[in-house]
Amino acid sequence: SLTPEQLAEIEQLREQRSSTLRAVSEGMEGHIYTAYPVLDHGFVRVIDYMGDDAAICQAARVSYGKGTKSVQNDEGLIRYLMRHWHSTPFEMCEIKLHVKLPVFVARQWIRHRTANVNEYSARYSILDREFYIPAPEHVAAQSVVNNQGRGDILTGEEATRVLEILKADSARAYDNYENMISQDGQQGLARELARMNLPANIYTQW
């Protein structure tokens, strides 16, 4: 969830108005700075963007020339590019996001493709006591047909026990994290070392 300081910053930014010669996407303008809740403590919000449909088409017509001659309008050209897997023109547009998400989701997200990421640093700052705990309907067994996927939903005592373990382990790990970095009566462990004990379901931001 957003802090009061972040909410105040969002309101201040949304009140600002500026003129520009850049291409403006009306659809994207409606999302600027708005935080959309994700999972139990997470969110996604658009901070900035560059380009629109016209930027994609402009790049495609420069790159492919005669290959796009039969396509008369931008919508048709974009469909043509997607259908034939011409992906580079789409990279002429960028979206700058502010995301709060569990660490294990963050690692899975960016392992598939190189990205420009400026992540909240646990070397310099203290992480919040916020962990992703799945809703009961998302607690599932390992799939017997897909090694990367989930199977049937766990129910009854097993589901309750699993959730209690997840909550207890998260709380205990954070308690130990706080104790290690505390300078009350001790020097306190360096933050870059203390963070190694935190579980992958703790929330980060980028």
Protein language model regions, located:
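Family-specific signature for flavin-dependent thymidylate synthase
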Residues: 1-206
